[in-house]
From Swiss-Prot:
Underlying gene: pyrB
Organism: Endomicrobium trichonymphae
Name this protein carries in UniProt: Aspartate carbamoyltransferase catalytic subunit
Gene Ontology biological process terms from the UniProt entry: 'de novo' pyrimidine nucleobase biosynthetic process; 'de novo' UMP biosynthetic process; amino acid metabolic process
Residues annotated for carbamoyl phosphate binding in this entry: 58-59, 108, 136, 139, 264-265
Broadest EC class assigned to this enzyme: transferase
InterPro entries: Asp/Orn_carbamoyltranf_P-bd, Asp/Orn_carbamoylTrfase, Asp/Orn_carbamoylTrfase_sf, Asp_carbamoyltransf, Asp_carbamoyltransf_Asp/Orn-bd
Catalyzed reactions per annotation: carbamoyl phosphate + L-aspartate = N-carbamoyl-L-aspartate + phosphate + H(+)
Binding partners and assembly: Heterododecamer (2C3:3R2) of six catalytic PyrB chains organized as two trimers (C3), and six regulatory PyrI chains organized as three dimers (R2).
């Protein structure tokens, strides 16, 4: 199995067939985690470079572990000690790394579209690890897989996204994937943090969490970006907590088997209470584990372009 593309730039333009191919490929990689030796030689001789212009704990380390478990060589570029601080352009940085025979380049950037710029200029496979407010496709995929693993289906699932939908690249990747796989999606948050016209995608909009949380199968809680308060997009942290924190009391309003998810890092006591984060309904740590297996699958399914390859 493979994807019919060399890059993973987002989920908006990834078809249902490719999404299902990824879901079907994750299980065998996850089964390696229970073995004493967790490595396979699938990518031996390949070089994976991570290029993160923004901070990351989970995503960068997850990609590194995934690549190493596939026996790839991994190079982490430290932006603040590289030529980037001397003004080197994104394309020149990418071409330099490709000249060093990098096969995969995993990039996180504050600029929406930065991975696409590299994909159009390089033969290496480009994987978007988060670009501005645009997308975070592997987070969307690991969230999708976690739901699939726990609920045994995606079609017909009722999924609620809570919080800052407007600025969340995680929300956007979740929405694109879930729409294509047939889930019913709802969002809830302050009106200033809900995108206009999101209902045109078939997404139901709520502003009352107590109402929205009833009858859903999955609650995916997004990190509230506290800097948004300075932009007057919500009045105060205290008011946000009162209206939108997922608490034990609100969890009791949902179905008994509702999944509680969070992409991390969590602001305990703000968007989610500690009781809920540590509850049996929470699968937050399982999301992290699944992220490694999902990223292993993505690395194996993409097809880097062979420069100067002869035609058949």
């Amino acid at each position: 199995m493979s994807l019919n593309c060399k890059d993973l730039l987002g989920l908006e333009h990834l078809g249902k067939k490719d999404l299902q191919t990824i879901l079907d490929s994750v299980g065998p990689f996850k089964s390696l985690f229970t073995r004493s030796v967790k490595k396979v030689p699938t990518l031996v001789g390949k070089t994976v470079v991570t290029l993160f212009y923004e901070p990351s704990t989970r995503t960068r380390n997850s990609f590194e572990i995934a690549a190493k478990r596939l026996s790839a060589d991994v190079v982490n570029v430290t932006v603040n000690t590289s030529s980037i601080v001397k003004g080197e352009s994104l394309i020149d940085t990418g071409k330099t790394l490709e000249a060093m025979k990098a096969d995969y380049l995993i990039i996180r950037h504050s600029l929406a579209g930065a991975p696409d710029i590299l994909a159009r200029n390089l033969n290496a496979s480009i994987i978007n690890a988060g670009d501005g407010f645009h997308e975070h496709p592997t987070q969307g995929l690991l969230d999708l897989y976690t739901m699939y693993e726990k609920k045994k289906k995606i079609e017909g699932l009722k999924v609620l996204l809570v919080g800052d939908i407007l600025h969340s690249r995680v929300a956007k990747s979740n929405i694109w994937a879930l729409i294509k796989m047939g889930a019913e999606i709802a969002v809830v948050g302050p009106p200033t943090l809900i995108p206009s016209n999101i209902e045109d995608l078939g997404v139901k909009v709520y502003y009352d969490l107590n109402e929205a949380i009833k009858k859903v199968d999955v609650v995916n809680i997004l990190r509230i970006q506290l800097e948004r308060q300075q932009e007057n997009l919500f009045p105060s942290v205290h008011e946000y907590v009162e209206l939108y924190q997922v608490t034990e009391e609100r969890l009791a309003m949902a179905k008994p088997g509702v999944l509680i998810m969070h992409p991390g890092p969590m602001n305990r006591g703000i968007e989610i209470s500690s009781d809920v984060a540590d509850s049996p309904n929470a699968v937050i740590n399982e999301q992290v584990t699944n992220g490694i297996a999902v990223r292993m699958a993505v690395l194996c399914l993409l097809k880097p372009k062979r420069k100067n390859a002869s035609s058949d």
